[in-house]
Amino acid sequence: MKLSPTVILAFCWLATVTVATAEFEDRSFLWRASSGERSVYLLGSIHFMKADSYPLSPVVENAFEIAETVVFEADLDQLNRAAVLMLAEGTLEGDAILADVVSEELYREVSKRLEAAGMSISNFTKMKPWMLALSLTSFELMRAGYLGGEGVDAHFDARAKNEGKRRDALESVEFQVSLFADLSDEESEEFLRYTLVELDAVIPVVDEIVATWKAGDPTRMEAVSYT
């Protein structure tokens, strides 16, 4: 009796999905690499989506249905731990406040931006610049209806859990947090400055990324992602 094919569905960042020998799957960001009876499906994932984004294309849904193991970028069971780590790493130490670690001009710009959104900078003075930058972007996404809980990875993680599929992760939450926590003070400030400049364009760009992802157009995705 032959063993059933081993099928792994992996969720990766759109910008890093590269499979030189993969077979492109029917106008979607799903690739398949096979060797004999073994198949690996690679799906470019968007981490923030709207609730009405599902179901996805039949080819993606079918890949999930036949998958025995589902591998995600990070362990979504560790989200609470990730939040605790982010808070710990993203908080300024001792008596330091945001005004101490960014320029006066940048501090004023951040304050105006928060006030325009109905918030006070006094609630964010202990955040490191990179943490505040992430928070500002998250606020914009949520206001437009994009939610992490509706992301492609979160969607399929919940389904995999409910259906009893094996689940695994490529990265630890510690590694993901370190990508920001390891920024130098100068890099952290520049990240916040860049975020403020680009903040008004976030939703139009995300709208286009999602539309391009649904259309399965990798050429257009590259243009959108690197402009």
PLM segments and residue spans:
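Structured, acidic catalytic/metal-binding patches in enzyme active sites
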Residues: 27-226
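Bacterial N-terminal signal peptides
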Residues: 8-16
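Boundary at the C-terminal end of the N-terminal hydrophobic targeting segment
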Residues: 20-22
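Prokaryotic Sec-type signal peptides and long signal-anchor helices
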Residues: 15-18, 45
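Bacterial N-terminal signal peptides that target proteins for export
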Residues: 1-8
